[in-house]
């Protein structure tokens, strides 16, 4: 997949540590097209000390890791976004007076993909009070939920999944969301997703429902919070929404820590 923040973060980190970095863009690479993942892994593993992969299927990054012979970092797949979790955990720790195992956060929106899955597992592994607020049809898979509960038994984490957005955010210190339509999905799903998720928009009212005047808003970005992008303008013209998963008022408010997070 294409990338802005993930690519820049890895390249800056590598250079800060004195390492070199090569970027293979999707349109210029033969990975999976003329050369198998297995063969690509064995070639790149002989040239590089580590590989970061950002793409669609989790099985691809796992196959790279199996055959490369060097560390492989998951920069994002459809299922997980572990490097974003490092940033999210650090950001919550920086913006809270409590340790993470005494911190509550909620994720509201479509929770079936990488951010919903990863935040649920993150919270469970760190012993946090983690809530998912979404229609049941958009909850993480049964396997992900089971893994979260298994981790919670070891850490003392509290896991809540609810269809009530206000219930999900009550008492939390942080409210997370993400885009409602993921990269690669067709435009035709927008109407269905808006109908399902209109009550899970992060608005000033939802922030206030936390009952916490210090509650913070988080989003891994990019966000559709106004009409200043081609997609944002298309959404406004087609559906009449100025801002989708989060309103401009929340995104630009003092409660928003998305740029620290990014």
UniProtKB/Swiss-Prot annotation:
GO BP, one annotated term: L-arginine biosynthetic process
Catalytic activity: carbamoyl phosphate + L-ornithine = L-citrulline + phosphate + H(+)
Localization terms from the record: Cytoplasm
Outcome reported for the amino acid change (mutating residue 136 to Q): In strain: CCUG 24846
Record's keyword terms, sorted: Amino-acid biosynthesis, Arginine biosynthesis, Cytoplasm, Transferase
Pfam families: OTCace (PF00185), OTCace_N (PF02729)
Recorded consequence of changing residue 61 to I: In strain: CCUG 24846
Record-marked site positions (Important for structural integrity): 94
Magnesium keyword on record: no
Documented EC number(s): 2.1.3.3
Residues binding L-ornithine, per UniProt: 114, 178, 182-183
GO molecular function: amino acid binding; ornithine carbamoyltransferase activity
Protein name according to UniProt: Ornithine carbamoyltransferase
Organism in which the protein naturally occurs: Neisseria polysaccharea
Organism placement in taxonomy: Bacteria, Pseudomonadati, Pseudomonadota, Betaproteobacteria, Neisseriales
Gene that specifies this protein: argF
């Amino acid at each position: 997949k294409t990338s802005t923040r993930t690519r820049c973060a890895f390249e800056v980190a590598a250079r800060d540590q004195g390492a070199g970095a090569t970027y293979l863009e999707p349109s210029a690479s033969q990975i999976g097209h003329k050369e198998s993942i297995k063969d690509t892994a064995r070639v790149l593993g002989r040239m590089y000390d580590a590989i970061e992969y950002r793409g669609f299927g989790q099985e691809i990054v796992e196959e790279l890791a199996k055959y490369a012979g060097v560390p492989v970092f998951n920069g994002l797949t459809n299922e997980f976004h572990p490097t974003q979790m490092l940033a999210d955990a650090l950001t919550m720790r920086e913006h809270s007076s409590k340790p993470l195992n005494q911190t509550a956060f909620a994720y509201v929106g479509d929770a079936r993909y990488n951010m919903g899955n990863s935040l649920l597992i993150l919270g469970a592994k760190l012993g946090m009070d983690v809530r998912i607020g979404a229609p049941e049809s958009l909850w993480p898979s049964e396997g992900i939920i089971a893994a979260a509960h298994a981790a919670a038994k070891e850490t003392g984490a509290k896991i809540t999944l609810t269809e009530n957005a206000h219930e999900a955010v009550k008492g939390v210190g942080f409210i997370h969301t993400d885009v409602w339509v993921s990269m690669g999905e067709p435009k035709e799903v927008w109407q269905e997703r808006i109908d399902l998720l209109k009550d899970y928009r992060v608005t000033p009212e939802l922030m206030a429902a936390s009952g916490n005047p210090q509650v913070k808003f988080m989003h891994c970005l990019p966000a559709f919070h106004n009409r200043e992008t081609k997609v944002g303008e298309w959404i406004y013209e087609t559906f009449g929404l100025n801002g989708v998963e989060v309103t401009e008022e929340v995104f630009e408010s003092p409660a928003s820590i998305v740029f620290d997070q990014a």
